[in-house]
Amino acid sequence: MLALGIALGYMGLLYFGAVIVPGIGFSGHLLAQVPGNFLDWAHAPGYGILALLLTRGLQRRSWPLAYALPVAAGAAFVFGLWTEVFQGSVQGRESNVDDLVVDAIGIGIAATMMLSATVRNRIVLRPCLDSFLSLWRVGSLVSLVRRTK
């Protein structure tokens, strides 16, 4: 439940960011101070983090990564599409396909990072763990033989 609450809270922050009108209110004045290029590319880490939170939330519910990752990535993309459509209905804001593409780039980067971490753990950590366990078993066997003598 905690992971779901964190993901929903984060989605609320992303939604709030989509409906801020530049120049109106305190948050709008802050938004007007941010350079345009930075604001455009801020979608990538925002939706990448959302995909990560959703994936981890599904994994906490015992979903394997092979199922959790595409479902979470799809949900993050649909949420990005929904916020872009809604943003277009807010006066002073506009929808932009480029923002949706940047959302997808962020989701793709997050998915790649999660998959590479899984592959790295299987390649690097698994052999090290197997070697440690085999040495531990040999050490246990040696100590057992010494005790019997």
Model segments located where?
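Membrane-helix interface segments
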Residues: M1-A3, R61-V71, R93-V97
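"…centered on the first transmembrane helix and the immediately adjacent amphipathic helix/loop
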Residues: M1-R56, G139, V145-T148
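Hydrophobic alpha-helical transmembrane segments
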Residues: L4-L8, P45, L69-G74, L100-A104
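Small-polar-interrupted transmembrane alpha-helices in polytopic inner-membrane proteins
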Residues: A7-A18, A68-G88
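Interfacial helix-loop-helix junctions of multi-pass membrane proteins
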Residues: I24-L31, G80-G108
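Membrane interface segments of multi-pass transport proteins and intramembrane proteases
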Residues: L31-G36, Q59-Y67, I123-D130
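Membrane-interfacial alpha-helical segments at the cytosolic side of multi-pass membrane proteins
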Residues: P45-R61, I105-N121
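Short, highly charged, low-complexity non-transmembrane loops/tails of multi-pass membrane proteins
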Residues: L125-V145
